[in-house]
From Swiss-Prot:
It is an enzyme of class 6 (ligase). Belongs to the dethiobiotin synthetase family. The keyword NAD does not apply. One of its GO terms (cellular component) is cytosol. Transmembrane segments: none annotated. Its cofactor is Mg(2+). It comes from the Bacteria. It catalyses: (7R,8S)-7,8-diammoniononanoate + CO2 + ATP = (4R,5S)-dethiobiotin + ADP + phosphate + 3 H(+). One of its GO terms (molecular function) is dethiobiotin synthase activity. Its EC number is 6.3.3.3. This is ATP-dependent dethiobiotin synthetase BioD. Keywords: ATP-binding, Biotin biosynthesis, Cytoplasm, Ligase, Magnesium, Metal-binding, Nucleotide-binding. Catalyzes a mechanistically unusual reaction, the ATP-dependent insertion of CO2 between the N7 and N8 nitrogen atoms of 7,8-diaminopelargonic acid (DAPA, also called 7,8-diammoniononanoate) to form a ureido ring.
């Protein structure tokens, strides 16, 4: 039986490929013999016309996982409005709290050897007036995988995010580059700089893909450093 592995995936910003990277991790872990589950504890913006109330990120994680989970476990806080979660929750008349998320992770861990928990937006997105994604990561206590959206400005964003993770006593287990801007000048030089600056293994760089493809993305990700710790 594989040694248990769970992680919290965060990113340098929103729309930088966290879901694709999370799905790639799930695919790679399944290839290593793990029973996998993906959680999106908080999601804002539901799919119009879907047969059930869901979200695009949730569906990508569900497709990449090998363990099927009910929606209430996959995403304890699914909000309709595509905006910052604390604002979407306010519009829905609810307050995002930690206990349902902790319960969802516990339930997922009873069925899967590896759970990938994808955060929402960047590392310090407000979930309520007093609670943000950084506090969620601390409460869950999982090793963190940072997804760096490779575009102009990523060096500053990555350095600040890695610093914020370390300041909270969390272990940065690795980072994944995801090419957001295929025309970015000095792409390879930026990746080399990130490798020097970020005190964690570089798990790989996902190129700009024509469409999200977890299996193809996984071919660019090396999970060995994650499983060796």
């Amino acid at each position: 039986m594989p040694v248990r592995f769970d992680c919290f995936v965060t990113g340098t910003d929103t729309e930088i490929g966290k879901t694709l990277a999370s799905a790639a991790l799930l695919t790679a872990l399944a290839g290593a013999g793990y029973r996998t589950a993906g959680l999106k504890p908080v999601a804002a913006g539901t799919l119009a016309g879907a047969p059930e109330r869901t979200n695009e990120d949730i569906e990508q994680l569900r497709a990449a996982a090998t363990v099927g989970l009910p929606m209430a476990t996959l995403c304890p806080w699914l909000l309709d409005a595509p905006m910052s979660p604390h604002l979407a929750a306010r519009r829905a008349g609810v307050t995002i709290t930690l206990p349902p998320i902790v319960d969802a992770l516990a339930q997922a861990r009873t069925q899967a050897d590896a759970v990938v928990v994808e955060g929402v937006g960047g590392f310090r997105v407000p979930l309520s007036d007093t609670f943000d994604t950084a506090q969620l990561a601390v409460a869950l206590g999982l090793p963190v995988v940072l997804v760096v959206g490779l575009r102009l400005g990523c060096l500053n964003h990555a350095a600040l995010t890695a610093e914020a993770i370390a300041a909270r006593g969390l272990r940065l287990a690795g980072w994944i580059g995801n090419v957001v801007d295929a025309t970015m000048a000095g792409l390879d030089d930026n990746v080399a700089t990130l490798r020097r600056w970020i005190d964690a293994p570089h798990l790989g760089t996902i190129p700009r893909l024509p469409r999200p493809d977890a299996r193809l993305a996984a071919s660019h990700v090396d999970i060995a450093p994650l499983l060796a710790r």
